[in-house]
Amino acid sequence: MDNFQALYDYVQKLSGKMLSAEEKRVFIAHFKPKKIRKRQYFLQEGDVCKYTGFIVKGAAKTFTVDEKGHEHILKLSIENWWLADFESFYKLTPSRFNIEALEDMEILQITHNLVEEFIKPIPAFSAMQNVLSQNNTIAAQKRMQSSISQTGEERFQELVNDYPHFIQPFPQNLIAS
């Protein structure tokens, strides 16, 4: 399956809407394939997040480093997930996070301006964004609640139960963090 087919399938599945041939051509014209090597950064703290990327292959971590040099992982991302510091991407402000490839990755990336001008008007993409926004809000609430009410071991077990496919690409110490 080519890179774009993975994106089409994802958008159509989440939105419940089919993409027309013309809409697919718009995607091809504006999303750019990019390869990111293991340990290479998609985004570094202090830089403005100019792109969002759809992960076709690979995995990444979003993290910050405290004043003592300790790494704090905020998010792990796998195939068919989006990469970006969305605050930086939408507000064009310096990022507070790093996004690093944990293995060789293939992504389809696009700029904020191109999303707004060409992609957002596509009904399936807009519907997909709404579903993602809802899912992200729910996930953030669940994560906050679990950090207050569950032990690390309980949170890990819930992750294994809810997302068994998610565990494979990552070492346990990353997931535990």
Model regions and ranges:
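Cyclic-nucleotide recognition modules
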Residues: 73-130, 134
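Short alpha-helix-to-loop micro-motif enriched in aromatics/charged/Gly
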Residues: 68-72
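Glycine- and acidic-residue-biased ligand/ion/polar-headgroup-sensing regions
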Residues: 39, 50-63, 79-80
